[in-house]
Structures are given as C-alpha cells and as structure tokens.
A protein has these predicted regions:
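Intrinsically disordered, low-complexity coil segments
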Residues: 295-303
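Short, charge-rich amphipathic alpha-helical segments embedded
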Residues: 36-37, 51-59, 63
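Short glycine/proline-enriched turn or capping motifs at secondary-structure junctions
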Residues: 301, 308-318
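Short secondary-structure junction/hinge motifs that connect adjacent elements
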Residues: 27-34, 45-47
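Short, highly charge-biased, low-complexity peptide segments
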Residues: 256, 304-306
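Alpha-solenoid HEAT/Armadillo-like helical repeat scaffolds in large eukaryotic proteins
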Residues: 28-32, 59-72, 98-115, 143-151, ...
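Structural detector for internal amphipathic alpha-helices that build alpha-solenoid repeat scaffolds
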Residues: 1-21, 39-54, 73-93, 113-136, ...
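Core helices of alpha-solenoid repeat scaffolds
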Residues: 22-26, 57, 96, 100, ...
Length: 330
C-alpha cells in the first residue's frame, strides 16, 4: 500500500468519529478491522473503543486472534494486538482466553545485533484486563506472579496494579515477596508499595516502613511516597518518625511533603502545617504549595497564614499570597 493510499484510508477512519450514520460507520470499521495492514487495524480498534461500538466486539476479537498467526510478519511491533487488546478491555470483553493468550505472548523481532521482544506492552495490557475476568482468582494470580518477574518494566508495574485491583488477600504475599526480592527499577517497587498498602493497610504500613531504612536512596523515596499517599493514619505516624532522621535527604523530604498534599487525612495537613512553621524555607515553600492543592486548603488557610506570618520570611509570604489568593479555587 502506498503512503498516499494509507493516509487516505486513515483519514477516512478518523472521519468516522464525527459520522452520524452509525450503520455506515460500523460497516467501515468492521472492514478496517479485517484489513491486512496492522497499523490500519490498530487505528480502527482505537476508534471503535473510543466510540463505544461494542457491537464490533466479535470483529475485534477475531482480528486479535488473526494477528497471532506469523506475528512478526503480520503485526510488527505488536501494533495491532496492542490496540485490539485495549479495545477488548475498554469495550467490556471479559473472556479470559484472549487476555491469557496475550499475557504470555513473546514476539522476538530482528534488531541491530540480534532480536528483541516487542510484546511487553501487550502483556501489560492483558495483565490489567485479566483482573476483571471471571476466572479463578488463583489462576489469575499465577499469571500475575509471572508478570512480576517479567523482563519488561511495564508488565511488572501493571501486574502489581492488577494484583491490587483483583483484591485478593493472597496477592499481598506476592507483593511482599517481590519487594523483598527487589527490582532494578524504582518505579516497579513504588507500584508494589502502593498496591500492598491498598490491599493490606494494617500490616502493610509496618512492612513498607522497613524500606525507609534501605541503603538505597531511591527505594527510600519510593517507600516514603507510597506511605504519604496511604489512607491509614499510621502511615503519617511512620513518616513523622522517619522525618527525625538527621541524614534524611532533601529529595526524600520533599517527596514526603508533596505526597502528603494528596492525602485525605487531616493528620497529613497537620504535618504540612508543622513543616511550614519549623522546616527550612525550601521545604516550607513546598508544604505551602502542597496545602494549596489539598482537600484541606480552605480549613487550613487561617493556621497557615499565621504560620507564614510568624516566619517573617518575605519569600514564603509571597508564595502564600500567590497560592492562596482570593482567585485560588477551593
């Protein structure tokens, strides 16, 4: 297919978004889903999902199956399968067979000096989708346990998210083991901390707090950020104790302050007000900004104004006036 022909086909597909003729747009999307070009199919799948055309689910599923045949040739970079898997999930498909096929798919494609797997995104999409399928939860957790050890970072992150979404207590054990085993990517550990705290806040706070003592600065930062977003007041207590560490870096302290700004807990707002009163100006400034976007913005304003006034710091006064001006939405 020439570039001009491809561009025309893609433009025609995009035009379907504003079409008032549902029958005609359905037929054109169905035809595009059956196209040999994987990019055309990927766009058709995305448009079908965006338009909530769930009557096309059988066509999306058939296209998904088709691109597993000679996949390196028919679907380089998994463009079609990625979009089709996302469309299946977004359109409400809950059949586990498609997603269990996708979560184990590895597609090695030629690269400079060897071959590389292009199916990481697909496995990550299917990990999230499986959590919503009416499959035995232990079978789902088996897939997700493998996902936590996947070579692709996105798959590991999405597997941790899916474990939390599944909501099974057995998932706590997988997350604890993963955290104790470690991961070279701090983002993965951060998601595991967050998922664990969501599943088991009672025991999770004490477990995640252990990692505040890690010798790895990035691990400490991820653990602190996850605790700051936790809805258990004991997490704020753990962070307050951790805050007393004399060698705690400015980056970790700033991450705690920013994270607490998103907390729904009044204890978090009190902590931030204390920071404004007693911490160095750079941290006090961050605490003011965090309070300005928190759910406690309005009720904390009088105490915050008093704390800023007591500091007698022109820069902090300027930040407060900027963040808490009358035009600032509450």
């Amino acid at each position: 297919m020439s570039k001009l022909a491809l561009d025309r086909k893609l433009a025609a597909l995009e035009a379907l978004r504003s079409s008032d003729d549902r029958a005609a747009s359905r037929d054109q999307l169905r035809k595009a889903l059956n196209d040999r070009n994987n990019y055309v199919v990927s766009r058709a799948a995305a448009i079908a999902a965006d338009m909530r055309r769930d009557e096309l689910l059988p066509d999306v599923l058939a296209a998904f199956d088709r691109f597993f045949v000679d996949p390196v040739k028919t679907d380089p970079q998994c463009l079609a399968k990625n979009a089709l898997a996302s469309a299946l999930r977004d359109l409400g498909h809950r059949g586990a067979e498609a997603f269990s096929r996708g979560i184990v798919h590895v597609q090695l494609e030629p690269t400079w000096g060897g071959r590389a797997d292009s199916a990481g995104t697909l496995r990550g999409i299917c990990a999230l989708a499986l959590a919503d399928c009416p499959l035995d939860p232990l079978e789902i957790l088996t897939y997700l346990a493998d996902g936590l050890a996947d070579p692709d970072k996105l798959v590991r992150i999405n597997s941790a998210i899916a474990i939390s979404q599944l909501g099974r207590p057995e998932g706590v054990l997988l997350l604890r083991l993963k955290l104790l085993s470690g991961d070279g990517e701090p983002d993965v550990l951060g998601q595991c901390f967050t998922s664990l705290l969501g599943l088991a806040p009672t025991g999770g706070v004490s477990f995640v707090s252990r990692f505040l003592r890690s010798t790895d600065e990035e691990v400490r930062l991820e653990a602190a950020s996850a605790l700051a977003q936790c809805r258990d007041p004991r997490a704020v207590e753990a962070l307050a104790e951790f805050w007393q560490e004399p060698l705690l870096s400015l980056d970790v302290r700033r991450a705690i302050v920013i994270g607490l700004g998103a907390s729904p807990l009044p204890e978090a707002a009190n902590f931030l007000l204390t920071c404004v009163s007693h911490e160095p100006p750079e941290l006090a400034e961050t605490a003011i900004a965090s309070l300005a976007t928190s759910r406690f913005q309005a009720e904390s304003r009088p105490r915050l104004a008093a704390a800023v006034h007591a500091r007698a710091n022109a820069h902090l006064k300027s930040i407060f006036d900027q963040k808490f001006s009358p035009a600032t939405p509450t």
